[in-house]
Amino acid sequence: MTLKEIEVLLQNAVGGIDRIYEHWTGCDGSVVNLPDYTVVIDLTGGYHVMHEDFTEKLAHTWHRNSRSIGIAMACCKDAVCYYDHPDGVDLGSEPPTSAQIEAMAMLTAKAEQILGLTTDD
């Protein structure tokens, strides 16, 4: 699905979304059929919409799923977060691609604009 097509779904969700949660899946980068998320971004930056009703309550974030959308990059297989590691995280054998980071940024910016959210929300 294109960002332009996703704009329509975002417009349909105006007033029903207060938060955007961004994730990495921790799966192999080819795994995009993950229904706990609203949108999954593949290794090339392509968008895969899991649910066209963006107000549907999903299971992407523990105890914070109401009135939110979950956007995930399909990446970071074998990633580990370290409390005492100098970098804080090892992004694993499949770190996010530049295309995924750009696609995440573009979708987040468009969602904030359409939904009337800010980075403080």
What are these regions (language model features)?
Residues 1-120:
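Active-site-adjacent loop/helix surface patches within enzyme catalytic domains
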